[in-house]
Design a protein with these regions (language model features):
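A domain-level signal for the structural core that forms small-molecule/cofactor-binding pockets
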Residues: 2-233
């Protein structure tokens, strides 16, 4: 299936935190970067990072532990840490719910991202739930993990990441009557700099439909999180 952007999930301007790269945006809705174009981005980023190290007084060229660091860092950003900036979300197939109209929830989904302010890592867990209508759509369970992985690998403002995951699930699971997303994550920009507080975590949630308007649905969502051992309420 051809890769494409899912309309309604891009919250910010291309190049901004939580957004796609300007290079990918130039390709249009159905575009992807070629291997050659990605390599050019890596080469340019490696050269820029080498200058960054030199500005900090790092003699990377003569240090055997650092001589390949600019290229390693550039590859890590493009192929891993920010991979979601350089590829659109793959087409995700939704299937008829076949009359099922109960809660569908996956908790304890790992998320790894990077703080957009100081480029320190973020790590945590995501819980996602939705309720399909009887004639609505459901997706394979691993697709929820894929959505988390895609948007997490962009560099994140956690609040926007929460909304992006919610919007993607909402768009893909057509005819749903509610979507809920919660992220519980620790930020190394808090533990490694500034206040240097270890163990502090941040919770963000985006609820819509029945999860926002009905106490019973909301309580079931948070109870399932508790049962999964993500956090205690």
């Amino acid at each position: 299936m051809a890769k494409k952007f899912i309309k309604g999930t891009e919250l910010v301007q291309a190049g901004f935190a939580n957004g796609i790269s300007t290079q990918l945006a130039a390709k249009g809705e159905f575009g992807s970067l070629t291997t050659k174009e990605k390599q050019e981005i890596i080469d340019n980023a490696a050269a820029a990072y080498a200058r960054f190290l030199e500005a900090l007084g790092c003699d990377w060229q003569n240090d055997p532990n650092s001589e390949d660091t600019p290229m390693r860092v550039a590859k890590a950003y493009v192929n891993d840490l920010w991979a979601g900036r350089f590829e659109p979300l793959s087409g995700i197939t939704a299937f008829p719910s076949d009359g099922y109209d109960g809660i569908v929830q996956e908790s304890n989904i790992p998320v790894t991202s990077m703080c957009s302010h100081h480029h320190q890592t973020i790590g945590g867990r995501v819980s996602i739930a939705y309720v399909p209508s009887k004639d609505g759509k459901v997706v394979g369970l691993s697709k929820l993990n894929r959505i988390v992985e895609h948007f997490g690998r962009r560099g994140a403002i956690q609040e926007q990441l929460t909304v992006a995951i919610h919007n993607a699930v909402d768009k893909i699971c057509e005819g749903n009557i509610g979507v809920a997303v919660m992220i519980d994550a620790t930020h190394n920009c808090v533990s490694c700099r500034g206040v240097k507080h270890h163990g502090a975590s941040m919770q963000t949630a985006k609820l819509s439909g029945c999860f926002l308007n009905e106490e019973a649905a909301r309580a079931e969502f948070y109870k399932n999180i508790e049962l999964a051992g993500v956090c205690r309420h």
